[in-house]
């Protein structure tokens, strides 16, 4: 990894007036030019991290670094970051041009340079021609674009976005997800985005930090976090999940619902108690006799792109299935899935333990594969 643009080293935050601990020993490094998301429910600590970077809050302990420089004691206006708030914080008495130009005027930039950079910023956010428009005559999406143009006008090293899409309707929010992601890639500026919406995080991010109760529970790419949740909280917070108690008999073999199934996970103790996760979209409906499991359909809802089916197996476990095929309430159906669809979670495993286990397991697999290849090559040489 190159030198991080932002780094948190053992950062904690306690509100002194009531003793509430909102961040607990946070450590991470952010690379330049990527889109990062802090994802969590209300009170998880995600906005606190954003406010610490911006300088709106002070850390109780630990170091915060911007481009290698410790910024704990650097005032807000001296930090090379800009924040886009949920409310956008635009000046209603100013035009679009005046709002975007405001940070440059504070720095006493020359008039011609202001005009040039405002024009470039408005082009970037597709608001060319709106220079003289008053803020009150803009739609929600247009106001957000103005706020983003103002955020990038000073060419900051980092743009911080505090749930900027939450006030928009669903269609506009989806459109702005594409626009924000495209803008970040064109600018090459590091974006740090805060949201409670897991779909936003999955759609827009290069890297996600899942937060709960003041801690980073898991971090990784959207695919990694969705496909390999570290624990029950992440599995239920990121998407829909079927989660069942299980026993890891040995590498590649897991037992749940009284049956044994092939899996792709390993690196655990023999007969270790675990949990399995199977996503609803990974379950295929079959004839009862052809399924690995048999379940009884209880209810179903049409979600537009699929039917959401709720069923129960003979042990009383509830199953959610996403299928393009309609089921009949009360009927028995079979469920099929592949070893790759079964995700194994250890109980009470930390992210550090999870990462170390995966790394050790991958290295062991690669070593074993290398030995097998060497034996095969030696056998071929002897035969020839």
UniProtKB/Swiss-Prot annotation:
SUPFAM superfamilies: MOP-like, P-loop containing nucleoside triphosphate hydrolases
Any one GO CC term of the record: ATP-binding cassette (ABC) transporter complex
Annotated residues for binding of ATP: 40-47
SMART domains on file: AAA
Domain ABC transporter: 6-238
Subcellular location: Cell membrane
Topology versus the membrane: Peripheral membrane protein
InterPro entries: AAA+_ATPase (IPR003593), ABC_SmlMolc_Importer (IPR050093), ABC_transporter-like_ATP-bd (IPR003439), ABC_transporter-like_CS (IPR017871), Mo/tungstate-bd_C_term_dom (IPR008995), P-loop_NTPase (IPR027417), Transp-assoc_OB_typ2 (IPR013611)
Catalysed reactions, as listed in the record: ATP + H2O + polyamine-[polyamine-binding protein]Side 1 = ADP + phosphate + polyamineSide 2 + [polyamine-binding protein]Side 1
Gene Ontology terms for molecular function: ABC-type polyamine transporter activity; ATP binding; ATP hydrolysis activity
Keyword vocabulary terms for this entry: ATP-binding, Cell membrane, Membrane, Nucleotide-binding, Translocase, Transport
Enzyme Commission number(s): 7.6.2.11
Signal peptide boundaries: none
Domain of life: Bacteria
Main location: membrane
Subunit (UniProt): The complex is composed of two ATP-binding proteins (PotA), two transmembrane proteins (PotB and PotC) and a solute-binding protein (PotD).
Family label: Belongs to the ABC transporter superfamily. Spermidine/putrescine importer (TC 3.A.1.11.1) family.
Known role: Part of the ABC transporter complex PotABCD involved in spermidine/putrescine import. Responsible for energy coupling to the transport system.
Protein name: Spermidine/putrescine import ATP-binding protein PotA
